[in-house]
C-alpha cells in the first residue's frame, strides 16, 4: 500500500519535471541557434 501512495506522486513529479525541461531545452536551443546565425 505504501508503494501505491508513493508511485503516483513520483510519476506526477517525473511528468512535471520533463514537461518543464523539454520546452526549456528547446527554448535555450532556439536562442543559441539565433545568436549563432546572427554572428
UniProtKB/Swiss-Prot annotation:
GO terms for molecular function: electron transfer activity; heme binding; iron ion binding. Heme binds at residue 18. Its cofactor is heme b. Coiled coil: none annotated. Its main location: plastid. Keywords: Chloroplast, Electron transport, Heme, Iron, Membrane, Metal-binding, Photosynthesis, Photosystem II, Plastid, Thylakoid, Transmembrane, Transmembrane helix, Transport. The keyword Transmembrane helix applies. Heterodimer of an alpha subunit and a beta subunit. PSII is composed of 1 copy each of membrane proteins PsbA, PsbB, PsbC, PsbD, PsbE, PsbF, PsbH, PsbI, PsbJ, PsbK, PsbL, PsbM, PsbT, PsbX, PsbY, PsbZ, Psb30/Ycf12, at least 3 peripheral proteins of the oxygen-evolving complex and a large number of cofactors. It forms dimeric complexes. Belongs to the PsbE/PsbF family. This is Cytochrome b559 subunit beta.
